[in-house]
Amino acid sequence: MPLSRRELASAPLWLAGCAARRNAVAPPAPVPMSRVRVAPERVIRTIVGLRPFRPSGFVVRGEKLDQKVVIHNYGHGGAGITLSWGTAQLSLAEAAQVETRQAAVIGCGVVGLSTARLLQQRGYSVTIYTKAMPPDTTSNVAGGLWSPVTAYDHERVTPEFRRQFGEAGRFAFRRFQSLVGDGYGVRWLPVYSLSRDSAHQPPPPESANSEIEPLYPDSRQLARTEHCFDVPYVYRRYSMLIEPAVYLNALLRDFLAAKGDLVVREFRDTPDLMSLRETLLFNCTGLGSRELFHDDELIPIRGQFVVPVAAAGDRLHDPRSGRHLHVSAPRWRVVGRQSRARRVRHAGGPGHYGSNPARERGGLRRHANSYNGQGGPLW
């Protein structure tokens, strides 16, 4: 359902890292926001997923294996949706010298689907091979805010990665703008970054994120009279929010409509991949690349989403807090928590993959307490 001007202006969402249209218009005056109604007893569902993180950043490069060329495109961390079109574009550039018009894409998450669609638009005949399809992919439990977050460790960034990161971010920024609308589940929202300690500071010039920061439209620190958050520092920019369930289904629909083939198949190892008939392969397997291609730098990081009961007028947001990055999306009524990278030796084990009730309760309280325009505790 389309948002009214009033709803769009008041829909709060926290997270840095999005590019938005230059002609986005900020609301001329603060709009009253209703209280956030979140509490442990209102939680109806908790979703946990693992993101494929590499401290040195994502991998986009070609490799010759036997008689095949494998183009790797994985390791996006918490920025898979955000960078998907951009790294797909980079991966196609890697394949430009391969003399074939038939390609296999391994993986059917957002990176695999984006890569497959760009291949089709360049005239390739494409088959996706995957062990899981939407709604059962890691991409389906993504937060969906356009934001290059948890994509790399600052200390590990190389000049080449910085070039790729900036190029991928700018391409993806332009591409997502063309998909705004109900059909793809993409829309614009204001983004509020909250702090009790200091005003927003732009990324330092040596940071890879400094390549993305100039894309944000109408970004500025808000005066205390321009918002109703219970914090002294509020920084606003505009971002795109992508609904994974709608978006991934739309990409899959487009792929099949363009006569793409899809085969459900799990690969045990690299030699198993070599049995495919295609000579050009795009590896978009995310965490699967750790086993398939022996990338020991690939680390699973846990993302946890808490879904409270939706209530009319609720608007969710979130501040930065210590070790964890908080995300919230008003359309889902989701309170999310993205933990820092941690090595998971047995991905899926109860100690690593399950939800954390203590974090869930703490996150809910932080949400409620920081959004308190009328004073006093909310619950």
Predicted regions: what they are:
Residues 89-97:
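Internal hydrophobic alpha-helix adjacent to the cofactor/substrate pocket in enzyme cavities
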Residues 1-16:
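N-terminal secretory signal peptides and thylakoid transit peptides that target proteins
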Residues 101-109:
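Beta1/beta-strand and adjacent pyrophosphate-binding region of the FAD-binding site
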Residues 23-66, 75, 81-83, 89, ...:
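Active-site substrate-recognition segment that forms the wall
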